[in-house]
């Protein structure tokens, strides 16, 4: 796999893309075993077609970070924070929605998220000095997913159609697995019954859908587990994100406080 931003130039034989290493937590095995043939075709379309038709095109994030978010166990998820697609500028996207690596300038969308957190929780004295959100995922259970996992440099939404079906299934998979866990726990003698009563839904997981693309995924989740807001991009943040209480709603649904600091 490539370890540079010039990732498409380092794939010597596109036919071998199905042999690249994808690291994910074991709790995602069922999903990836089901999807791997289709994922291989998606990656071939991205790297073969774009390299052939657009000689100098760059794809973000780097190929070894495309599935980075899935290194988190599904059992640890408290919040699915769903955005649109990766940052389409150089040295920004790192495989976690809205996040950037330390040393990278904080993008406007993430800056608005930080601004909103400071607005909602002034007593917590949050001080956001960088855009590395790894602690949110590792310690707070925030699953930082985009509806599209890749993007062409300078072209937002350029791969949204390619990833739509897969990320639909990701949302369904999370919801089904979390429901099934509680359902099976409460119905040990009837594990073959596929009918899940809504009263058994695990409400300790919240889907925060930011923007129109993310909100299209609402059909795969019970409404009691959903919070929606506009995307924090400067183009839409003032129309239903900034000045709201979206993160308070998340904590209220969870029944616990989230430490949104990044340290």
Each language-model region and where it sits:
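Compositionally biased, intrinsically disordered low-complexity segments enriched
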Residues: 2-20, 184-204
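C-terminal functional extensions of proteins
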Residues: 247-263
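A polyanion-binding, active-site-adjacent surface
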Residues: 26-184, 202-206, 213-219, 225, ...
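Active-site-proximal or metal-binding-adjacent scaffold patches in catalytic folds
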Residues: 230
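Helix-centered, glycine/charged polyanion-binding patches within enzymatic domains
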Residues: 239, 243
